[in-house]
Curated annotation (Swiss-Prot):
It holds the Pfam family THF_DHG_CYH. This is Bifunctional protein FolD 1. Belongs to the tetrahydrofolate dehydrogenase/cyclohydrolase family. The lineage of its organism: Bacteria, Pseudomonadati, Myxococcota, Myxococcia, Myxococcales. Its EC number is 1.5.1.5, 3.5.4.9. Homodimer. It comes from Myxococcus xanthus (strain DK1622). One of its GO terms (cellular component) is cytosol.
């Protein structure tokens, strides 16, 4: 039976450590500050943004949300970002995705100054991360997965890591991190056009799935002893839940848990790590500001 990789508990420990670092910065006259820009009133986005600002405040950081109307123009949004870029009390800027269709999300993300891009999506940070520059802000989900593997003493050196999915937000930066000197993993990336997906997933010592499709990975697709990291977030109807739904991952958890050596649950696995690494990146941004 696989041990459960508890992202909630790992996050709790990390946040306690970070709270001490925040207090030390405050003693030096710097309070880390994160500003989140939310366009529109999507309930899921509102809830996610609220959880981010609450997490900031729980550590003694400043967390603020700027809510703009659904029909905000690109120019007006850029003006808000310009103001935040110029504000020395704001160390991290995050524009909550998804954006309305009329806003060019790539241009929006690139308008954030790289030194405040705590989501790690700016091309400058992507390039710095690719070459292993410590100044880079690494996207929060890949960074959280790496931290989870490290803290759970799961070795990656010489291991075959198979990633299902090829997104710029998770899979590609994660592959780069895993192949870097230190982690030293051999990485295979698969995607929707990969023929015979199971022939690849069965080779994995560590299987990371980030697609967004319920039960994509079944028990016959993994080998005994595999470590499974499930990044998927899928909403399924559940009349027994007060909300009328529950969240599940991309992996058939109940079927694979008896086979694997370790596995992340959904919820409570990778998700908490993502928000915690956003806090870590904001703390890093404040430190880098102090050093300049």
């Amino acid at each position: 039976m696989a041990r459960t990789l508890d992202g909630t508990e790992i996050s709790r420990v990390m946040r306690a450590e970070m709270a001490q670092d925040v207090a030390a910065l405050q003693a030096a006259g710097v309070t880390p500050g994160l500003s989140v820009v939310l366009v529109g009133n999507n309930p899921a986005s509102q809830a996610y943004v609220a959880s981010k600002t609450r997490a900031c405040e729980s550590l003694g950081m400043r967390g603020q949300t700027l809510t703009l109307p659904e029909d905000v123009s690109k120019e007006a949004l850029f003006a808000v970002i310009d103001r935040l870029n110029a504000d020395p009390s704001v160390h991290g800027i995050l524009v909550q995705l998804p954006l309305p269709a009329h806003l060019p999300y790539k241009a929006v993300l690139e308008h954030i100054h790289p030194a405040k891009d705590v989501d790690g999506f700016h091309p400058v940070n992507a390039g710095l991360a690719f070459v292993g520059d410590p100044r880079a802000f690494v996207p929060c989900t890949p960074a959280g997965i790496m931290e989870m593997l490290r803290r759970e003493d799961i070795p990656t050196r010489g291991k075959h890591v198979v990633i299902v999915g090829r997104s710029l937000i998770v899979s590609k930066p994660l592959a780069s991190l895993l192949m870097a000197p230190g982690p030293d993993a051999t990485v295979t990336i698969t995607h929707r056009h990969t023929p015979d997906l199971a022939s690849f997933t069965r080779q994995a010592d560590i299987l990371i799935v980030a697609v967004g499709k319920q039960n994509l990975i079944t028990a016959d697709m993994v080998k005994p002893g595999v470590v499974v990291i499930d990044v998927g977030q899928n909403r399924v109807s559940d009349a027994s839940s007060p909300r009328g739904y529950r969240m599940v991952g991309d992996v058939d958890f109940d079927a694979i848990q008896p086979i694997a050596s370790a596995i992340t649950p959904v919820p409570g696995g990778v998700g908490p790590m993502t928000i915690t690494m956003l806090l870590a990146n904001t703390l890093q941004a404040a430190r880098q500001t102090q050093a300049r």
